């Protein structure tokens, strides 16, 4: 039976609340490793927001850090604006990811976060979370684990851009995206790209034309099937080798 207070919160939030205990991607998020009592305490500080529409900003560069955001569904891109006024994409965040860690050092967001599709997020007030983590070692350790994962992702991206050619960059991007979908219980072989080819090119330091040409090459080589935004991995071993992962995960 669902405790009465949770039923009330569901009604007051307009039916959008999915609590940590019920969330299908909690193993990727902050609740992982927490016991039932700790989950209840965390659940009480989380604010469930209504859907964020495609193109809507979650926060902007320069905004004060007030909350971290756990993505329940959808895709969020993070980006900065260069001195020349150009957009530079720094990441694509999927369900289970937390957005806003890079604001902790200065308590101010250094980047923008924008929905690439209709998305649902849980807003977690940072000051309250910080206070709670001081009382709950499991929570503190999980936050550190998530932050470590983000640092590792940044390091992998630097390596990707510095050592791989265009073909290897795109192969690694698709291969890693496939793995991330698998972690979330989705098909690692067939999926839809929520980002445009322009976004992918921006992220990988390649032109839109190069992305389109490479996708065509992968298709001719029977590595992928491409239909608009829909990707099917036909030869995962070949994709893995091209991406620099000799042992495919699938």
Curated annotation (Swiss-Prot):
Q: Which residues lie within the region annotated Activating region 1C?
A: 181-191
Which GO molecular-function terms appear in the entry?
Answer: 4 iron, 4 sulfur cluster binding; DNA binding; DNA-binding transcription factor activity; metal ion binding
Activating region 3D as annotated region, ranges: 112
Sequence segments annotated as region (Activating region 2B) = 123-124
Q: Which residues bind [4Fe-4S] cluster?
A: 20, 23, 29, 122
List the residue ranges of the region (Activating region 3A): 60-61
User: What ranges does the record give for the region Activating region 2A, renumbered to this chain?
Assistant: 47-50
Q: How does it assemble?
A: Homodimer.
Q: By its UniProt entry, which InterPro entries does this protein fall under?
A: cNMP-bd_dom, cNMP-bd_dom_sf, Env_Response_Regulators, HTH_CRP, RmlC-like_jellyroll, Tscrpt_reg_HTH_Crp-type_CS, WH-like_DNA-bd_sf, WH_DNA-bd_sf
| Biological role | Global transcription factor that controls the expression of over 100 target genes in response to anoxia. It facilitates the adaptation to anaerobic growth conditions by regulating the expression of gene products that are involved in anaerobic energy metabolism. When the terminal electron acceptor, O(2), is no longer available, it represses the synthesis of enzymes involved in aerobic respiration and increases the synthesis of enzymes required for anaerobic respiration.
**Taxonomic path:** Bacteria, Pseudomonadati, Pseudomonadota, Gammaproteobacteria, Enterobacterales
Region Dimerization: start and end of each range? 140-159
Q: What is this protein called?
A: Fumarate and nitrate reduction regulatory protein
Its needed co-factors are: [4Fe-4S] cluster
Region annotated Activating region 3B sits at 81
Cite the Gene3D superfamilies for this sequence: Jelly Rolls (2.60.120.10), Winged helix-like DNA-binding domain superfamily/Winged helix DNA-binding domain (1.10.10.10)
- Point out the DNA-binding stretch(es): 197-216
Q: What organism does this protein naturally occur in?
A: Yersinia pestis
Q: What is its main location?
A: cytoplasm
Entry's localization field = Cytoplasm
Task: Tell me the keywords, alphabetical order.
Answer: 4Fe-4S, Activator, Cytoplasm, DNA-binding, Iron, Iron-sulfur, Metal-binding, Repressor, Transcription, Transcription regulation
Region Activating region 2C, as annotated, extends over 127-128
Q: Where is this region: Essential for the oxygen-regulated activity?
A: 20-29
- In this chain, the stretch annotated as Activating region 1A covers 71-75
Region described as Activating region 3C: spans on this chain: 85-87
One Pfam family here:
HTH_Crp_2
Region named Activating region 1B: 116-121
């Amino acid at each position: 039976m669902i405790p009465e207070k949770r039923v009330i919160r569901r009604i007051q939030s307009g039916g959008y609340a999915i609590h940590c205990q019920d969330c299908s991607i909690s193993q990727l998020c902050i609740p992982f490793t927490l016991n039932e009592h700790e989950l209840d305490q965390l659940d009480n500080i989380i604010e469930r927001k209504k859907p964020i529409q495609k193109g809507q900003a979650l926060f902007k560069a320069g905004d004060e850090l007030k909350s971290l955001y756990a993505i329940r569904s959808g895709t969020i891109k993070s980006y900065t604006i260069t001195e020349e006024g150009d957009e530079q994409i720094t990441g694509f965040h999927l369900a289970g990811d937390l957005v806003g860690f890079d604001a902790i050092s200065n308590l101010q967001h250094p980047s923008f976060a924008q929905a690439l599709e209709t998305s649902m997020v849980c807003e977690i007030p940072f000051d309250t979370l910080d206070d709670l983590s001081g009382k709950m070692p499991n929570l503190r350790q999980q936050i550190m684990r998530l932050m470590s994962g983000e640092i590792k992702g940044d390091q992998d991206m630097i390596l990707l851009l510095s050592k791989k050619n265009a073909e290897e960059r795109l192969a690694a991007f698709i291969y890693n995206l496939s793995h991330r979908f698998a972690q979330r219980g989705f098909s690692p072989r067939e999926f839809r790209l929520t980002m445009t080819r322009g976004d992918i090119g921006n992220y990988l330091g390649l032109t839109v034309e190069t992305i389109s040409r490479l996708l065509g090459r992968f298709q001719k080589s029977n590595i992928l099937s491409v239909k608009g935004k829909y990707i099917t991995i036909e030869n995962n071993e070949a994709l893995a080798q091209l991406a620099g992962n000799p042992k495919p995960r699938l």
